[in-house]
Amino acid sequence: MTIHQGGNSVIDNVPYSLNTNVNDSIYSEKGTGRKDAEDHTPSKITDLEKNVDHSIPSFPENDPKNYSEFVNLNPPKRPDLEHTRGSSWHTASENVNDLAANDSTRVQTPEFITQTMEDENVEVPPLERDERDAAAAHTSKANRNSARQMWAQLMASVRKFKREDEKPILKENLPAINLFEAGIPASLPIAKHFIRDKSGQPVLPIITDLIKVSVLDVEPKHNRIHSTFTIQVEYGTGPHAIRWLIYRQLRDFINLHSHFLFFEFQHRFSGRRMKLPKFPKEVLPYLVKLRGYQKILYSNPSDQLIDETHSISDISWESHSQDGDRTTGQPRHANNGRKKHGNFWTIQGNTLGVYLQEMIHNLQFFPEVNVLYSFLEFSSLGLYLAGAGTFHGKEGFATLKRNYSPTQYMLCCNTTMMKTRSQPFWIIVSESCIILCDNMLSMQPADVFIWDVDFEITRKNFRKAHSKDTNEKIRLSHHSFKIKNRQKVMKLSVRSGRWLQQFINSVQVAQGLTAWCEIHRFDSFAPVRTNVAVQWMVDARDHMWNVSRAIKNAKRCIMIHGWWLSPELQMRRPYSMAHKWRIDRILNEKAHEGVMVYIMIYRNIDATIPIDSFHTKEHLQSLHPNIYVIRSPSHFRQNALFWAHHEKLVVVDDAITFIGGIDLCFGRYDTPQHILYDDKPVADKTGLCEQTWRGKDYSNARVHDFFDLTEPYKDMYDRLAVPRMGWHDVSMCIIGQPARDAARHFVQRWNYLIQCKKPARKTPLLIPPPDFTTDQLTDSQLTGTCEVQVLRSAGLWSLGLVDTVEQSIQNAYVTCIEKSEHFIYIENQFFVTSTTCEGTTIENRVGDALVERIIRAHKNNEKWRGVIMIPLLPGFEGQIDLQEGGSLRLIVECQYRSICHGEHSIFGRLNAKGIDGSKYLRFYGLRGWAHLGENHELVTEMIYVHAKILIADDRVAVIGSANINERSLLGNRDSEIAAVIRDTLTIDSKMDGKPYKVGKFAHTLRKRLMREHLGLETDVLEQREYNMDGLDRDTEWKRVEVWTPDEGNAINGSAYTAEELKMKYRSQSQFTTTPDILRKAEKSMKKLDQRVSLIPSSIEFNIKTQKDKVEFEKNYEKSKKGPDVIANALVGGIPLSLKTKEDSLYELSKFSQCGEDQRPMVLKDPDHLVPEPSRPHCGNGLVFYDDIPLLEVNPISGETIPKFDASSFEDPVCDEFFEDIWSKVASNNTTIYRHIFRCVPDDEMLTWESYNEWKKYGKRFKEEQARWRQEELSNLHETHEKSENDPKNPKAGSQGSGNTSASEDSKTEKPKTRTNNGLQVPDKRVVYDLLRGIRGQLVELPLKWMSTESNARNWLSSIDKIPPLEIYD
């Protein structure tokens, strides 16, 4: 044979049409006696070059016996070429290297032989013939060897072309976009839908051209049929291709081929032939040594399988031949007994990979291809989940033997739980759960088994009954296993122990990639997440605006979990300018766009809680099939007659979540000013002078609870007589990984409710979203500077937790109080803790933590303070002295027993230790006043504190839906959700006059709340500080040391400055506002009536015509549009750029590039800072004109009213702020409200007798105001002229300034009142002078109210004690 260093040999030009069986060989006849020719291993071309002198047999020149014997035993198979064998062979002295050097000579050999054959037909004289024969005898052997060599080369070329013809066409995978441009691949999934097997199941709709299979490794075993192959399956192209590993044994391939042989036999009778590829017999592990393979049991490192990055088309087919080297055509016997090169396991694996690829290609249009897809672990849902970037684990069939949950029997809700099923499920091991589907084609899970800290998977141990040998290996069950979490136990059975072990291994790998099975801080279900973007929002205006924007931008799914949801709620105001922002219209629009909407609400009992959840469900589900609503709990079925789902949660696209105390329902919308009246008409011709709280949104639960909710725009009260009750609340927006933690909580509850009671409408189970990767967060700019952990209260009835109750919210509250160094700030709807009331022990430990912390501060002589804000009265309907006020009295009793009444209260326990509790802990509430109706009647109403927050040391904050009572904190009653936030971005501040590092999130939130309560214009202040800050919260990912409370006494963890976090600064050139625009906005802001309208009064009168209205609406809509911003700026973070126009005040929004996030307020300009508000409002939420003096001295107490500004709130502990400003303002406001309105509750009201006297005073005060109005009407003309000429005496109620005839001197005489024969009503002048002395809405919580009656056990009636106390505490 000839080996060329370059180019092709002559016989390489044999036409492709020459097709010979690959087993044909001129040396294939039996009887050669060369057994080494039977044993062949593929060898590489480099090996042939090294051993070329052994590849061709040689014979002695003078040994005709050997020659003739060789010729006779190996005749050529081609008769037409038989005569071409020459007259002689090469001698032994000639080797292949010599032949290779004489290629040109051998090339001429055919012509020489042909000429000789022609000469034989010519008549030659005898003498010449003898001479000629003598000359030919000398070269006969060499010529014959040359012919034989030529024949071998010719046949090798024929085999080479035949192999190329038979080789499968294995193409490199093209990009998916190129495949779909062809048109045909895109139609294949649809076509496969119509191909169905005998059971009616369609073919899995996948594109086979995107599948690649390769064997990466082989684990040999002595029993070689049990060798395990590691197979990589790839679906897709490019960097987003989905890859996973499966493990199969050789017998699995044999079983697979046997199945398809049976299918092929069936298809013969149907007239449709199945082109089944032949099973590669060379992979069978028999006679490995005799067949010439290296007998090794482990892979040779120098002869590895193909790399996972190579496609199957890169496999060298020539290296797999058993007939010889298919590249060179070397005959098999030419090895001359040499052991063949190549690892059998490598060849076996690669050959099986090629076999699988052929199967995929040939069977793609047969219904039985699903058997092959199940062999490769394909499924519709598995591909969908893996395409989202999640972990893709083991898949396969398993039979459910038992599905047991103790809650299903404890709570009598076992109607929908699947106990067993003979039909096997398709099981998918995902990143943090195990999914059960009806089959591999299903996209809806039949059950979802979510992992938690108690998750475990076990196999039952068996020991032979007759064996007593303890050293004997315990035999494990080969088929059954059990999985367990906090909710239930499932027993499953699989087809083999191998499959089970693979399943367990896959679960263990997934567990190593997730943190859901670990114990977390505060014993929460969720881990601590770092580098999170968070933004707080105070009051529902900001919350609802941002929620509406997030829902509007939803792309995949919306999850809403609330106590109440009003479908007709207007998310933005005014109504006429934002009619499309009604929540049912937004959800309907998104559902038509394909977004899935899932809503969970509390299933109310109409007789006690009139929120009409049935109306909510029926209305929303009637809008679109993509909207699903579940009401819960089923009170009797789940044994939850008294408990409620109290979470307030919105999750959009598993990326952004809103957590707090605000429900999306009537009565919650409010602004920081907390205006108490809204008596304007519904709308005028322009649509601008209209109500802010329309219909049921104008509410006062203290007067009357909600009713007739099917008519949402029908008023419940007379607006001219009943003020609304202001609603103060706090929420936050979290972006990034904690949003997926909140979504996981929602999914867990959603699935549990479906299993407890099957909905009337088919409702899908949900799958928890996978965790974000660091790259996904940074690439999507979903990072921030906060450390966030989601918390919850959950138990048996609410989440099906067995043998455990999660109370991580209570743990966080207690830990933050215990670890605080200087200060805590709490706002909550209730305060019932750590006491004994009516023989019932209150168990939650918040009160205990406060007592212990105060005792430690007193012992160590530390200055530690606590501020607690709660409503002045619970928000329940009814008068305190009437029978229907029983619930009100019972909750008040629990609260005062927790705070100050009795030896078990906080102050009682501190007094027993000789500690004055008021030195460390203060309780406050909120109250406002307003004018109602045409008579401008003065009224007061409390502002309901509904927030649920805790701030410790201005470093950490807890925000959520949990109240401080037994229902919310114990975990086995109401279900709650919250989050603890610690900002690693620190700023310089002070505590007790000393420098102190504080977290920016908690510090700014605490200042924002305190400023609002003391009456400062918070919107303007936020804008002013925002312009001064100049930071863009676009941060790099930072490795953070989380706060671990068990390792220290302080709230510690990583803390960084803006420079250390590499935070960017906004460019000054981005601000284009001029000083003229600033002055214009300043002037307009002074006349901005924030009660009901967004339009400054200086512009409102100019909008008179329809044309003006259209122009205004155009500008308004335009102002809401802004460029997209990063997630940190989405809900009140710092935008990337700020731009304003000189011709529009409506683009001057609170957060610039979130044009739809906040109502228009003020402009932004770093060069000309927004001026600080010069004065707080006087309790009614409206700022007085600067030329109207405020009262500087309280005429009742004779004390100076504190002066303060925005900079006074930095240090909440120092006496200069806490005692001289905060506490004194609250005391001053309380005194003024007491003197004017005789409010309930109050510290001077100790008995029922005094309570009745104060009620009579309220009637007399109302009558007295009517008399004032009559006097005004009789002197209307004189009063009008006086109000125009005297700026210090504006019309009462016209701008909220009151109608007063105050002198230039702001001091007034101390008013006189009678208390012996009834309380005297002060005159008009005194009343309005006193109102000018109120600062903000902060008042003291009266701790002595009705204490005499409470101590005498005369506070609660016998009827009040009938209901269980657990309902209220």
UniProtKB/Swiss-Prot annotation:
Residues 208-379 form the PX domain. One of its GO terms (biological process) is phospholipid catabolic process. One of its GO terms (cellular component) is cytosol. The keyword Translocase does not apply. Keywords: Cytoplasm, Hydrolase, Lipid degradation, Lipid metabolism, Meiosis, Repeat, Sporulation. Its main location: cytoplasm. One of its GO terms (molecular function) is phosphatidylinositol-3-phosphate binding. It catalyses: a 1,2-diacyl-sn-glycero-3-phosphocholine + H2O = a 1,2-diacyl-sn-glycero-3-phosphate + choline + H(+). The keyword Oxidoreductase does not apply. CDD domains: PH_PLD, PLDc_vPLD1_2_yPLD_like_1, PLDc_vPLD1_2_yPLD_like_2. It is found in: Cytoplasm. Activity is slightly stimulated by oleate. It comes from the Eukaryota. Its EC number is 3.1.4.4. Required for meiosis and spore formation. Seems to be involved in the coordinate induction of late meiotic events. This is Phospholipase D1. It comes from Schizosaccharomyces pombe (strain 972 / ATCC 24843).
